[in-house]
Design a protein with these regions (language model features):
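C-terminal catalytic "cap/lid" subdomain
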Residues: 1-141, 145-173
């Protein structure tokens, strides 16, 4: 088990995360700072076969892990926390597409049971974040978390909004 503590309430007991999860429950919200987002737009109209592989090979070559990734027909957005080899990575990415970079981002992760038959939880999270510009969303790879990318300057607002929307009922007990 892992105990997550509340940075806004350091004396609070926090939340224990273990393998016993109540169906449809939301357990915790966590944040990871110092994230850099890279967007690659294909030079072709649609992503060619093997395009994603080429992108991932570049990151692998420079031993840089990817935290989040989203794709469309013509673009890939991904986030990293290690920028030590960013200049070299960008040079190679520019050979296969148009590249833009956003710095000072935060991944906000909502942990819970988001099984496909759970209804309403994702909309509660999105409604809570309606006051914050969301740059990217990763959902579906795991039934246990949804990750959102926001600017670091919006982190506090996002965490407070999620806490109020998702856990306010716990404080009333």
């Amino acid at each position: 088990p892992v105990r997550l503590l509340n940075t806004m309430e350091p004396t609070a007991p926090g939340t224990i995360i273990n393998n016993e999860m109540q169906k449809g429950s939301i357990k915790a919200v966590a944040a990871k700072d110092n994230i850099t987002v890279i967007k690659i737009v294909s030079n072709r109209m649609l992503l060619a076969t093997g395009y994603l592989a080429k992108v991932f090979e570049i990151f692998s070559k420079y031993k840089t892990s990817i935290d989040m990734v989203t794709t469309s027909e013509v673009a890939i957005s991904l986030s990293i926390d290690n920028t030590s080899r960013l200049v070299s990575i960008l040079e190679e990415l520019k050979e296969i597409g148009t590249v833009s970079v956003d710095y000072h981002m935060t991944i906000v992760c909502v942990v819970g049971d988001f099984a496909s038959d759970s209804v309403g939880y994702t909309s509660r999270v999105m409604q809570a974040l309606s006051c914050v510009p969301v740059r990217m969303i990763a959902y579906g790879a795991s039934n246990h978390n949804i990750s959102y990318l926001v600017h670091e300057s919006d982190k506090q607002k996002a965490l407070q909004a999620l806490s109020s929307a998702l856990f306010a009922h716990d404080k009333q007990k």
